[in-house]
Amino acid sequence: KNILALFLSEILFRVVKETEPDSRLFEYLFESIQLLELSDKGGRNFHLVFLLRLLHLSGDNPNVESYVAGSCFDMLNGVFVDRIPMHRHYLNRQESVVLVRLLKISFENMSLYSFSRQDRVSVINRILEYYRLHLPDFPEIKSLSVMQSLFD
């Protein structure tokens, strides 16, 4: 849990730039931290759920309604498309299926989902790429390599 907390605190340090109080964000963070403290199951997916919900709160969440089987996810525009975009920031069809699956995960059901180490590493890298595309000045996350060591 300590490594996970370090990773999430680095993310929050880079993402949260609010100068005004944000009760929705505070409530989300408070409840998430409490859940992490109390949880003994599903820890391997906690950071994925946390990051995707944080995107939702920031208004930069992927548009799931545009998904059709066989489509690719255009990370620049945040939508699923039927053709590979003309830029390099997209998820292929297989990665897009994993994203759709991920977007259905919640803190309540996260322990029911399992991912291979390869999928887990790929997904976290792609989520962080999405953050870099949509949040100004979002840097490389230094604690990511430590976090990924948990997957071994």
Regions of interest found by a model, annotated:
Residues 1-152:
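Non-catalytic alpha-helical scaffolds and adjoining flexible linkers that form interface surfaces
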